[in-house]
Each structure stands twice: as structure tokens, then as C-alpha cells.
Amino acid sequence: MKILVYGINYSPELTGIGKYTGEMVEWLAAQGHEVRVITAPPYYPQWQVGENYSAWRYKREEGAATVWRCPLYVPKQPSTLKRLLHLGSFAVSSFFPLMAQRRWKPDRIIGVVPTLFCAPGMRLLAKLSGARTVLHIQDYEVDAMLGLGLAGKGKGGKVAQLATAFERSGLHNVDNVSTISRSMMNKAIEKGVAAENVIFFPNWSEIARFQHVADADVDALRNQLDLPDNKKIILYSGNIGEKQGLENVIEAADRLRDEPLIFAIVGQGGGKARLEKMAQQRGLRNMQFFPLQSYDALPALLKMGDCHLVVQKRGAADAVLPSKLTNILAVGGNAVITAEAYTELGQLCETFPGIAVCVEPESVEALVAGIRQALLLPKHNTVAREYAERTLDKENVLRQFINDIRG
């Protein structure tokens, strides 16, 4: 098939949506599909355009797929308004490269959310070219915005009503909606999408990469990061933004400062400088910050953690399913997850006892108790690893998805 992938995040971004979209495109091309990509220059999670890329110029790249990079506004400190301008700027700049694909006549257009701002252009191209459309939802942008109080006066405000109407239009006017969890599938149905048009397309893990991590690689990375051998590692690896509520990790580290533990915060994001300042003001010698590590180092990094933190604010847990969790499960890590019992993560922990420790969000007491509980467990979590092997293998997930969208 001729497949056009349209979304703001793409390789070489190392985390989150860009990583998964890039791996999907490589897999599709390797299966013999003709793939084109319309995207932006890499900027996430640093919120800074990568070296050798420009935020202001178009760029065409040839490889496994033909890629068009489109200009966009990248705020250094993303606020709600700046984030909307950021997403909108990509929707505008990518419109003409998108329309240019009419002559190519793609068979399928896969639009990756965020950003919903791109949905109208995708639908127009589909109408002009005869393509079928798939809107793949990695993040319910509107729900996340409302759940985190970023839309002003809550769900009844004009901004919230406008955003909800725009989202409804995007969801109802595509051929299929795919998303990454069962609860997010149910949410699509609640928003009016016909159940037969909803596709389960979870984030995957390259299971084999995480099954046989050499102890020597773990020791080498530990030495490189200058982490002591006589202390257990409480690891957070990923985006450092507003959805996570990492202030509570600072509080937890403060309460556990006299125990033989190191809180290792690995990653980038708009909230990192503020967290570093908080830790410095409290004199937390048991907390260290590190830049995002390379993808090659990820298996050793995750195996190094004695306890993994998957932290989100209340209200965000069902709008966003953390992609980092797939690899934590694959490596057999013990995770402490902050999520309400009714959410996807809460249900996961209830359905598969022992897969992780689930605690109340935004509670320092619960987080500290969860960390203590996780540290008492065997270092290798067989429940987590077996779940990953059964349900998160990359080849199985992508093969099922392509079968689903063939129609």
C-alpha cells in the first residue's frame, strides 16, 4: 500500500510518540509498503529543535521513507497558549506539503494525535485522493487539557466547549480511530465513534532488547553516571513536564533522605529546571538529575533501576497512557504507578496482581509507601515480563495493525 503518515513527532526523537511513529514507519517500509511522512523537525522532549535541523525551513529527507520536515514554533517554556500556537503552527506549515500528496494518491493516511489541528487537512486530502483515513490517538489532548485545568473555567467554559466540539468533528469524520489502550478505546466510543471503527494499536516494546541485558552493561552505565554501588536506585526516566506531577517525587526524596537510596531523574522537559531548583533548595543529596540517555543505553538504564516511578497527576492517567511503562515491563522492573483504580493503569494492576504497585495520585504518603513496597519485591518482576512478552511484542502489534487497516 501507499501509506502517508502525518504527525508532529517523528524520529530521531528518542522518547514518546516520535519514537513509536519512527519505528512504525521503518517497519512498514521493511514490509514493502511505500511510505511518506509529513512531520516537524525533532524538538521533544527538550522543547528545542535538534542540531542540524531548522525550525524555520522546509526540508526533504530520503531513506526508508520520504520525509518532509515542516517549520513550526517551538516555545522554550510551553504554556497553554504557547502550546496551542506550537500545534497550530505545524498544522498551517504542513498544509501545502500535505496537499501536494494528492498526485501521489495514498491508499491510507495515518494521522497521529497530537495534533488534532491537522485532522481537517488530512480529511481534505482523503476526499481529494480517495484515501482511507486512520486517526491514531496517542494522547487525548482535550481531555488532558481539561483534566489538568489548562482550559480556564473547566469543562463548562467556552474554550473547553470549543475544544470538545473540534475534537468531536475530528473523531467522527475519519474512517477509523486507533488508540493505545482499552480504556482509550472506550473513551473514543463514549465520544461517539462507532465501536466497529475503533482499532486497538498499543505501544510496543522490542522485547528481545530488554530480555538479555548484560550485568557488565549495567555496571558500565552505573559507573558512567557515577551512581554508588551501595545504594538502591529509584528511577524516573522520561519527559519532565506538567502532566507528571514530579513535585511529589521531590517530597518523597526529602522524606527518604536518610535511607540508602538515590533518586535518579533521567530526561528533559519544560519542568526540569524548576525541579532541579527545588531539589537544590532542600539540599537533597539523594537526588540526581541526568540528561536523556541514548536508546542504546535504555535497556541497561532500566535494568539498573530497583524501583521505577510512573508518576502522573490526578485526571491525567486515563487521558495519557505512559509509553515508558512498556519497556519497564519488558525488562522485568518493579514500577510504582500513580493512578486511580478505575483508570487503565489501575485496572492493569488489579487484573494482573504483582505487575506493579498502584498508589493514589498526588499523595506523597502513598508514593513513599509504594516505593517502600516495591523495594521489598524480588528485583526481577516475572509477572511484568511475562505480560510484556504476551501482549507488547513489536512484531505482533504492528502486524495486527496493518491487517486491521487493510479493511
Curated annotation (Swiss-Prot):
Keywords noted in UniProt: Lipopolysaccharide biosynthesis, Transferase
Pathway membership: Slime biogenesis; slime polysaccharide biosynthesis
Gene3D superfamilies linked to this entry: Glycogen Phosphorylase B
Coiled coil location: none
Record-level GO BP terms: colanic acid biosynthetic process; lipopolysaccharide biosynthetic process; slime layer polysaccharide biosynthetic process
InterPro entries listed in its UniProt record: Colanic_acid_synth_WcaI (IPR023910), Glyco_trans_1 (IPR001296), Glyco_trans_4-like_N (IPR028098), Glycosyltransferase_grp1 (IPR050194)
UniProt keyword Transferase, yes or no: yes
A single GO molecular function term of this UniProt record: alpha-(1->3)-fucosyltransferase activity
Family annotation (PANTHER family): SULFOQUINOVOSYL TRANSFERASE SQD2
Protein's recorded name: Putative colanic acid biosynthesis glycosyl transferase WcaI
Record organism: Escherichia coli (strain K12)
Upper classification of the organism: Bacteria, Pseudomonadati, Pseudomonadota, Gammaproteobacteria, Enterobacterales
Annotated gene: wcaI
